[in-house]
Structures are given as C-alpha cells and as structure tokens.
Amino acid sequence: MALEDMEKRYRISDLSRELQVSPQEVLQFIRMNGGKVGSTSSMVNEEMRGMIFGNFSVEKKMVDEAMKIRAEKQRRLTRLEEQSRKTYEKEQQLRDSMHVAPLVPVAPLHVAQDVIVEVAAPPSAQADHTVQAEPAVQTESAVQTESAVQTESAVQTEPAVQTEPAVQTEPEVQTEPAAQTEPEVQTEPAAQTEPAAQTEPAAQTESAVQTEADLSDVGEVSIVPENVEVIDVPELPMVPVMPVKEEPSVNDQLVSFDIPQNIGGLTVVGTLDMMNPFDRSESGKMKARKKNFKEQADALKSEFDTPAGEEKLVDDKLVVKKKPVKAAGDGDTAPAADDALAGKKKPGKKKKKPDVDEKVISANIRTTISGMDDSAGSVSRQKFRKMRRMEREKEHEAAEAFRESQRAIVRVTEYASPHELAELMGVTAKEIIQKCFALGKFVTINQRLDKESLELIALEFGFEAEFISEIEATAVVAEVDDAEDLLIRPPVVTIMGHVDHGKTSLLDYIRNSNVVAGESGGITQHIGAYEVTVEGNRKITFLDTPGHEAFTAMRARGAQVTDIVILVVAADDSVMPQTIEAINHAKAAGVPIVVAINKIDKPAANPEKIKTQLSEAGVLVEDWGGEYQCQEISAKQGIGIEELMGKLLTEAEIRELKGNFSEDVLASGIIIESELDKGKGVISTVLVQRGYLRVGDPFVAGNTMGRVRALMDERSKRIHEAGPSQPVRVLGFEALPQSGDVLTVMASDRDARELAQKRQVIRREHEFRRSTRVKLDSIARQIREGLMKELSVIIKADTDGSIQALADGLMKIHNEEVKVQIIHQGVGQITETDVLLAAASDAIIIGFRVRPNVNAKKLAEKEDLDVRFYSVIYHVLEDVEKALEGMLSPELHEESLGSLEIRQVFRVPKVGNVGGCYALEGKVFRDSKVRLLRDGVQVYDGQLDTLRRFKDDVKEVDAGYECGLSLKNYDDIKVGDIVEAYKIVEKKRKL
C-alpha cells in the first residue's frame, strides 16, 4: 500500500514545469486551497494535482477554443466556396439558353481582350442590362471570392462618363417583381468613388429612353482580339442621369460576369437575376454566419477589454478592414461595393459593412487568455508585484539616504598627506595646513598625518573620516554590465556549520569522493571549492568552510562570495556557537539559508529539538511557518540528498542569479585560498565572478600582479578558460596574495604593474609608521605597568588561509600578564632566515603542515631552538596555551596545619622566653610558618626558632601532646596566646 501511495504523489516543481508556470504560483495556489506544504519540493496527491491542473490549464482550454473557432470559420468558408462554384455552373447553363437582344451599334472604343456590354432590355423582358468595356490598362474588380478568383472588367466609354464595377452579392439567384419597368444605366461624374451601378423603379422611364437613344447613335461594337490595332474615335457627349429618390419595393442588383471567349459581338443578359460567386453582398445566410462569428468574438472581447483593443474597435466592436480608395480613371482599383443596394440612401453616404480582421481577433484572444491566466493566479501575482514595488521603493530610499550620507563622508587612507586630504574634501592644501596650525600641529604639504589628526581636520570642515585600505583606494572601477550579456549562472553554495557536524561528509556524498580522508584529524582546514553537476546537467559550485572556531575569517569570507548557505546541524547534537556564528555571517551578507539537519539515521537524533534551538537563534523553518527551507538528511546513507539539491535549485531559480558572460569584458574574481608549491610556485584558488579568465591574461590581485600561466580545475586538469561561478586554480602570481583579495584582469602588463607598485608603496609606508608607533607604545606601557611576558612565535604554514586562522586563534590566547607576539608569518617551508630570526628574537617556530629544509634543520639544532610541527590546529592552540599558562605567576593559597595554646612561660638565660604549649589540633612542623594570636588579634607572623619535647628537638608535634617552643626574633609571649601553624601552597593559573 505504501508503494501505491508513493506512485500517486507528485512533486510541485515537476508540476510547475509541466504546466510552464512559476513554482511559487503553484505553491501559493495550494496554500490558498488549504494545502500544507513546506516548499516547491514537497509532494502532493492525485486530488491536489487535479485541482492544480484545473486551475492552471485555463490557458490551454482557451487556446483550444480559439483554434476550434478558427477551424469552424475555415470549414464554413470552404463550404460556401463549394456552394458558390456549383451555383455558378448552374447559372452558366441558364445563361446560355437566355434570350439574346439585337446588337446595339456603338462607336469603336479602346477595347482589349474581354468586352462586356450590358444594356437595358425592353420592358417586356424585365431584365437588367449593363454595358461594360475593359480598358487597355487592366484593373482589378472588387468582385472576388475567397478562392482568389479575379475578373477584370470596367466600363469606359469616354473620359467624362465612367461606370463603377458591379456590386458583390452572395451566390444566390434573386428575381425581381413583374411590376418593375425599364431600368436605366446610371452614370456619375469622374470624381465620384461610390458604386454607380444602381437600378431605379418604373418612375424613371424618361431617363431610360434617353439613354437608349444615345446608345443607338453610337455605332456597332465589335470584339477586338488580343493583339489588334486600336482605332481612336471622337468623344461622345456626356449625358448625366440623376437618380430619382424613391423607395424600391425589392433590392435590385446589377450583376456583371465574363463572357466566354468564343462569343462575339454584344451579349445581352436575360431576365434572370443571377448571383455572381465573387460578389460579397450581404445575404441572409452570410449575415447569419457573420453574426454568429461576431457574437463569439464580442463574447471574448467584452469580458476583458484592453485600452489597445478599444482604440481598434469600430461600431459593434469589430475592426473594419478598409481598402484603399483610388480614382477609377487612373487605372487603379476602385473601392468595392461591400453592401447591397437596399433601402433609400443618399449618394455618397453609404456605409460599408465591416469585415472581420483575423489578426486582430487572434490578438484579442491572446489578450483574453492572458487576462484569464492573470485572474487565475491574481492573488499571488498581485502580492508579488506589490512586494517588488515595495522593495524597489525601499531600495530607492536607501540609495537616496546613502547618497546623502556620502556627501558628508570622506574616504581616506591612513597616514594621508594634507594635499591628498584637500583633494578629497574639495578644499585647498593651504586651508588644511592652517587648520593644522590652529590645532597646534606644524605640518608641510606632503607630510603624513596620523589617524587622529585626519579625523580632527575632517570634522573641522564638516566631514566624517572613513578610513579604507590602500586596495580600496586604488580599486579598479568595473564597467556597467549590459543586460544582453547577463545570463543565468550556476549558484555558489557554501556549506557552513559546527565542527564534526558532517559538512564535508555531505559534500563527499555529493561529489562521490572521499574528501575527509585527505584532511588531517578528519576536520576541514581549508576552503574547498568544487564544481558539481547535478540532475538535469545543471552545475552548482560548492564551498566547504571549516567549522572550527579558529576559522572565523574563512567562514566570513565564504559567506561574502556565496549565493546560498547550507547550514548543517547534527540531529544528535545541538546548535553550537559556531552554528550561531555561521547564521550571523549569512544574515550579515544577506544570503538565504537552507537548513540541513544531518545524522537523522542515528538513534539519538532529535530533529525537533534542533528546530526549536534554531528558532531561538532566529532561524524559523518552513515546517513551523517560517521562511527558511529545511531538509532532514543523512550524509552517510544519502537520505534526503536529492530533495536538498531540489531546494537549492529552486532557491537559485527564485533569485535569478546572472553573470556577465561577455567575451570582451575584463574578467574579475576573488581569491579563495593561496599556497606556495615547491615546483609550481604560488597557486591560488580563484572564484571567477565576471567575464572569462583565460591563459595569458595580465592581472592584479591585492598588492601583487602576474600573468595567468595555467588554469586547473579542482581535479588538477588543465583548462583554457573559466567563466562566472567557476572555481579554478591559477598559476602565475609574482608574490603570494592574501585570501579575500580581488583579482582583476588588466588591459596590459604595464597597467597591472603600475597599480601593484602603487599599492605596495602605500602598504609599506603604513606598515612602517604603524610598527614605529607600536614600539613606542610598547615602551611606554612597560614603563607604566611593568614588563609584560610575551611568547614570541614564528608561523609557517602551507596556505594563506591556514596562517590567518592560526594567527587569529593565537591572538585570542592572552590576558593581562601574558600574550602571544607573532614576529613573522609566511607560506612555505621553514628556511634558514626563519631560524636566524627566531634565534635573534628568542622565539619558537611553529610549522603547520610544512617541514624545514636541510640547512634550516641543522641550523636549528646548532642554535638549540624549539621548532614544533603540527598538522591539526587543535594541537597548536593547546600547546601554546600551556606555554602561556606556564609563564603566569602561580596563585598562592594558605593551608592551616595545626594550633597550640601557651599555658606557661619560662625564662631561659641567653635564649629568652620559652612557652610551654599544648597541641590543640592538627600537626605542627618544625619548619612551619606560624602566627601568634592574642585575644583574637595577630601580634606576630614568622617562623619557629625551636620546637622540643622535654629536652629533645623534634620535627613535629601531634594534637594532644605537650611541647616547648620559642619564636624567631620575638620574645613577648604570654599565657593564653594561641600559636597557629600554616603553609603557603602555590597553584597554577589558567588563562
């Protein structure tokens, strides 16, 4: 049953990828519906999965519905085209059997291939006729169907008389009533652009007769083949015919169509009112179809109207696709007659029927779908937008406050000159010197000022002095990254926690390699930088920091360069001081924390106790309603590791980590660790943060410079370049850089060398002045307080990070009487110079994971120096602490031995007074210190001169015995006095 339940559960992150929505939106939806989930890596059942798909699949439903509407429209158009084709074939058969009227003689015109002349038939025929002739320049008729069948026809008898193309109708045959009399051919001036072919009722008989008379005077019309010679004829007089406005009983239409090529002469159309298949006039069925489609479009648009959509909507909220209006006389296409001739309308005032624009409808459907998607997750998106807006406002306010504060802060290096300070504050050097004179300091323009003087002078000018290092003062300003160069980069994850809580074991399982075996004592003593490929071919860079208290600087440095912190806490232990310190480092750096409760496979594991202690430390996990993700794991068994990786990737997706991957930008990174190799020289572990670091690039790092000679990954495999978030080992430093220094690629070796030399000059000057002052202060302190005991040491280690950790740990071991004085520290093996320096300063040499060379070893034996070697930092700190405790003065304690009562006093010649005593308690020794008490008041403190029983000298007297004694250099003893015997005991002190 348990296996079946597992098969029916789904991970939230997988569902979000399947639906192509944000994991946070899915998480918010589950919580809004009463679901209790901790993070996007949590599992949900089949029922909740159905709810999620029902909510977030609205977009798919709307897209499917839009596709159905589009398919239905295409199907209807296809069916309409098929019906039109069949109707047109039937009409052709009827047209061949129609009555043909006598030919009307017309003067020769400019005629091309097809000539269609339609004239009015006699009243008995009750048919409409239209005379059309195609000009030499072919024009496109507005009569065309969806299948792109085009016919070219136009009436052009003379320049002044122009007729318009026939109107568009549905392919249906309409007959007119018999009461209709002879219609006419209506002509309009050339400037008129509206359709001119329009039938009139029987009241217009006079105009019709006149038109027939004019046509009878024109000569005979003959069909000219395609390539015949055109004959010019005189222009005919224009006979304008104005329509008589009267409401017709039935909508009359003029229909034009092509005459077959095998028919010659003039063709007269019969009485049938046939429909052209390319006519677009509104019929009942087409109107119903358009109305149905319009209602569907309006239903979608009315719910979610956008400002852009409102501008495009016309009348009934359908976009009218207007055709270009051009004069018919210039050979271009005239506007199409989109509506039928129905009702009483004024010429030039006809309103075109709207045509649906499919592109606009598709855009509106997409807008509707987007709106429905927003409404589905409106709560989470609105909350997210509100939070982002508030964050931007806070950032803007903080930036404004920062700019205001910067106006009153001057950033200056220690021991700056008046000239440099004047440039920073925007005043003259003369004013600075005058202020110094007013403060009682006589300085020159290039003289160096100490820290107190700089602070006082800055306050005099209304500034607050902020002291920076020489590296910050000469930092290279990076260019602003282009948005197009910023791409998603792998996250940098730092594993932090207390010692022996399983940080390296966790990384060991992830990397599938035994890292702990390579560390002395089973604890991590370096920052290890590794790049790991996880599920989905995604990369994560891990930094493994030491957990011992001596490596505080390393943990702080790891928190400053990381994106996510994994806080490892042992379930069978508790939240330790280094755990609290790691939490503070992460919070100070603004880095998100993912809690990993390790060792849950042990019997004594108690994860709930760990969560309680974490909440007391300010880390409230998601299971308890907090914001920090938590995962119970076992680094040895691999339990929960996959879920932990999923939470890391989810956190990285939320933060949208990006880096500059441009090929042209100068690379930069941070020094994680440095060491001195005997064969390769200085090797530094660098975490690239921007651009690509390549072999041959000149660079500057701190006070040193160099050129990249080789790049190696964590497995010592040579590579050619390293991108953002990639750790790499770099060879090519001229000197050993410090951990935490920024490595910046320069344009040339010259620029790198100049910047490094400038920093070195400032550093040497600062160290010289600082060391001189320390010596003077040391002399003054020794005069005031007496000589302080100091343990002088020289530290040599394998890496710069280990040196810093050792130095920090040793400097913490001190009190008012003793302390550690580090004379020299460096990376690499112990040399003869180190031995000579130790002999001159009476110091001991501490070698951490390094050994002396042969000459140094012989010299140390000759000088009888104490050289100690260690590989675990515990042992170094313990031995140094014992040595300092041995230098402390011991504590003195008084221990009572016994007491005697003087009961009789004897006077002995040449000796003085001797007391006869009785031992009350304890034991009194001959060499014991004694004090004489009289009435409870001490009157003597010294030693015994003699101690006898009877006439014999004894060494001790026990309680209950009598004895005689005399005090050294004291003779005033009386009966009743009490003699107390005691001794002073020395006790070693602890730091």
UniProtKB/Swiss-Prot annotation:
It holds the Pfam family EF-G_D2. GTP binds at residues 497-504, 544-548, 598-601. Residues 522-526 are annotated as: G2. Residues 343-353 have a biased composition (Basic residues). Residues 544-547 are annotated as: G3. The keyword GTP-binding applies. Its main location: cytoplasm. GO terms for cellular component: cytoplasm. InterPro entries: EF-G-like_DII, IF2_II, IF2_N, P-loop_NTPase, Small_GTP-bd, T_Tr_GTP-bd_dom, TF_IF2_bacterial-like, TIF_IF2. GO terms for molecular function: GTP binding; GTPase activity; translation initiation factor activity. Residues 138-160, 201-210 have a biased composition (Polar residues). Residues 488-658 form the tr-type G domain. Residues 598-601 are annotated as: G4. Residues 126-220, 325-359 are annotated as: Disordered. One of the essential components for the initiation of protein synthesis. Protects formylmethionyl-tRNA from spontaneous hydrolysis and promotes its binding to the 30S ribosomal subunits. Also involved in the hydrolysis of GTP during the formation of the 70S ribosomal complex. Belongs to the TRAFAC class translation factor GTPase superfamily. Classic translation factor GTPase family. IF-2 subfamily. This is Translation initiation factor IF-2. The gene is infB.
